[in-house]
């Protein structure tokens, strides 16, 4: 081995010995599911997000990864409408039951669980599975929509606009039992969820938010208060009195469609990049993030390949910022600078650098 190779190897060993290892053990679950709504393509979201470099980005941040791959959900051959309106109830119920098992297994194994969808009906499974291991969890729901319609208030029949109603204890007597949903047990109470970024809320949803005193911050509130104040109030409510696991459920349509056009229900007036990244950065800084959903990336709805890639890349940015990437740059953290052990070694290192 040459003299230069020996010195280079010595330097690499010394630098690696002072790198602080990440505390994050992250499980990645792909959930290619679209039957919570009617538009095809959102089942391609997990592949698009993976292609945008998700696993490498998390690995570069020092995360210890367990990749469950993309799940294959059991098909339901005959899935009639419920009440002549609700779309694919048996498929949604069964897929979420299967997803809940995997999420529970990941969280029980000590991993922070990242689920990439897929439509937002998947939150029924991710939060249910998470709550089995962490019954005191709290939820930060970042979305343009409240997704809290019930099967009796929805006008679209799409279950991706209803997941919270199945999870909220206060609505237990307001939600009929759909075929395929008998396994679901409400697992969160209204003080345990905060919405951030709402800008398209149906009248029945607004009634529910007010009646059950559910905290939400609309885009108007964010403009009025500033995102820093919004996050301070969110944490004061959810973890101010008790430290507990956080479940971040993030719909890509929270961004303005100029930034994330490849999604099924875009709406003007969404947040810019810095405000949304601040949310995930601050959640990371609590040290309490236990599970994360990133949903509703639909590459088929992009007007161009560039739009599809930009939306998927933004999804990766959200996930990475939840695990330590900052807008200062995502760095493996140093505990200290590596000192030279002797003047001779310092001289050799200088030669290598030159």
Curated annotation (Swiss-Prot):
Name the major location: mitochondrion
Where Mn(2+) 2 is bound, by residue? Answer: 143, 145, 251, 253
Q: Which InterPro entries match?
A: Arginase, Ureohydrolase, Ureohydrolase_dom_sf, Ureohydrolase_Mn_BS
Enzyme nomenclature, EC number: 3.5.3.1
Single GO molecular function? arginase activity
Bridged cysteine pairs (disulfide): none
Which reaction equations make up its catalytic activity? L-arginine + H2O = urea + L-ornithine
Q: Which domain of life is it from?
A: Eukaryota
The UniProt record lists the keyword Electron transport: no
The pathway where this protein functions is:
Nitrogen metabolism; urea cycle; L-ornithine and urea from L-arginine: step 1/1
Could you tell me the keywords of this UniProt record? Adaptive immunity, Arginine metabolism, Hydrolase, Immunity, Innate immunity, Manganese, Metal-binding, Mitochondrion, Transit peptide, Urea cycle
Transit peptide, from-to: 1-22
Task: Name any cofactors this protein relies on.
Answer: Mn(2+)
Cellular localisation: Mitochondrion
Question: What does the UniProt cofactor note say?
Answer: Binds 2 manganese ions per subunit.
GO BP terms in the entry: adaptive immune response; arginine catabolic process to ornithine; innate immune response; urea cycle
In terms of PROSITE patterns, this protein maps to: ARGINASE_1, ARGINASE_2
Q: Locate the compositionally biased regions of type Basic and acidic residues.
A: 344-354
- Chain sites annotated for binding substrate: 145-149, 156-158, 202, 265, 296
Task: Supply the Pfam families for this chain.
Answer: Arginase (PF00491)
The entry describes its oligomerization and partners as: Homotrimer.
Q: Which NCBIfam families match?
A: rocF_arginase (TIGR01229)
Family to which this protein belongs? Belongs to the arginase family.
**Record's function text:** May play a role in the regulation of extra-urea cycle arginine metabolism and also in down-regulation of nitric oxide synthesis. Extrahepatic arginase functions to regulate L-arginine bioavailability to nitric oxid synthase (NOS). Arginine metabolism is a critical regulator of innate and adaptive immune responses. Seems to be involved in negative regulation of the survival capacity of activated T cells. May suppress inflammation-related signaling in asthmatic airway epithelium. May play a role in promoting prenatal immune suppression.
What protein name applies here?
Arginase-2, mitochondrial
In its UniProt entry, the species of origin is given as Oryctolagus cuniculus
């Amino acid at each position: 081995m040459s003299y230069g190779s020996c010195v280079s190897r010595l330097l690499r060993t010394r630098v690696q010995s002072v790198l602080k290892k990440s505390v994050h053990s992250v499980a990645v679950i792909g959930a290619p599911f679209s039957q919570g709504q009617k538009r095809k393509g959102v089942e391609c979201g997990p592949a698009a997000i993976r292609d945008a470099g998700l696993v490498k980005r998390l690995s570069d941040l020092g995360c210890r990864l367990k990749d469950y791959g993309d799940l294959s959900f059991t098909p339901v051959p005959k899935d009639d409408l419920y009440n002549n309106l609700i779309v694919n109830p048996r498929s949604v119920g069964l897929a979420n039951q299967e997803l809940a098992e995997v999420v529970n297994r990941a969280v029980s194994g000590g991993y922070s669980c990242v689920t990439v969808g897929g439509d937002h009906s998947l939150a029924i499974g991710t939060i249910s599975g998470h709550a089995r291991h962490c019954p005191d969890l709290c939820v930060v729901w970042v979305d343009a929509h409240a997704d809290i319609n019930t099967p009796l208030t929805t006008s679209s029949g799409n279950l991706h606009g209803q997941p919270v109603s199945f999870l909220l204890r206060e609505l237990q007597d307001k939600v009929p039992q759909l075929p395929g949903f008998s396994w679901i047990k409400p697992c969160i109470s209204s003080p345990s969820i905060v919405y951030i970024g709402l800008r398209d809320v149906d009248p029945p949803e607004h009634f529910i938010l007010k009646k059950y005193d559910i905290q939400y911050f609309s885009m108007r509130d964010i403009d009025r208060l500033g995102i820093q104040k919004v996050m301070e109030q969110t944490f004061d409510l959810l973890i101010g009195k008790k430290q507990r696991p956080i479940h971040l459920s993030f719909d890509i349509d929270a961004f303005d469609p100029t930034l994330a056009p490849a999604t099924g229900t875009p709406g003007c007036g969404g947040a810019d990049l810095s405000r949304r990244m601040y949310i995930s950065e601050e959640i990371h800084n609590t040290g309490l993030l236990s599970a994360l959903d990133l949903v509703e990336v639909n590459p088929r709805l992009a007007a161009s390949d560039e739009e599809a890639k930009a939306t998927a890349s933004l999804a990766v940015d959200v996930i990475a910022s939840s695990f330590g990437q900052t807008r200062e740059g995502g760095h493996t953290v140093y505990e200290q600078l590596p000192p030279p052990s002797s003047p001779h070694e310092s001289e050799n290192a200088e030669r290598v650098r030159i």
